[in-house]
């Protein structure tokens, strides 16, 4: 079965957050600036959810010439006073690092009343769990496996949360392209980054997946000190999962990657067995 969000207008995670913001800001007459990094998909959904809303601006950072022309046009042809698109020289990781740096600088973030709709915002992860419950109740199956196209590990981490809530999920399968850090981490324990290569699936052209840190936190027994030390090693590009941690991950996760030739073949040969939900 195929669970497909065909239209950006159906991006419930962003619509939910946008409506939350508008509701609570109307109560206290406050104003916020949303800063978001995108590899293509998040930006389109977030813009559609935030445009024309009162007391909100949205600034979208995308990597210059590293998103698809369709994604760029969806984002950059929106002519609303509260929507600002900014192309950044570099890749998605560079955009994401800028947003993280702004959040860490509390003087700056408070001064501009900054907030976000990336998966930095926990509300977005919670909203994404809805997909999994919808699929389960639509199929009325006893147990499901989910294969999820994965770049920043947000959607599939939401599936992990759904499983922890009690949803009967067997395996969560990370599907990624040749920027394969998540596949290497889950299959071999190798979480060292390489140079990002441009592909035909630019939304997955990411090396360091932010939400993988949340999974590391979980498998370390929710120990923030251990997680902090591990993430310091990640920043030094010197971290490999130990056998115990890898075994914990493999209880819930599997992974696979496709190179560019395999991706093109898949694009041109849709499976007749796909049944949309």
Predicted features, each with a name:
Residues 1-8, 12, 267-277:
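Single conserved hydrophobic/aromatic residue that forms the stacking wall/gate
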Residues 5-9, 13-49:
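Well-ordered mid-protein domain cores that form the structural environment of catalytic cofactors
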Residues 9, 13, 38-44, 122-125, ...:
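Gly/Ser/Thr-rich loops at beta-strand to alpha-helix junctions
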Residues 14-26, 49-59, 76-78, 163-169, ...:
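A glycine- and small-aliphatic-rich helix-loop capping segment at beta-alpha/alpha-beta transitions
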Residues 33-47, 52, 156-157, 166-176, ...:
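Active-site histidine-anchored catalytic micro-motif
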Residues 61-69:
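Hydrophobic, small-residue-rich alpha-helical packing segments that form membrane-like cores
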Residues 71-120, 178-269:
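Active-site/ligand-binding loops adjacent to catalytic centers
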Residues 96-101, 106-163:
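Domain-scale recognition of functional cores that engage charged ligands
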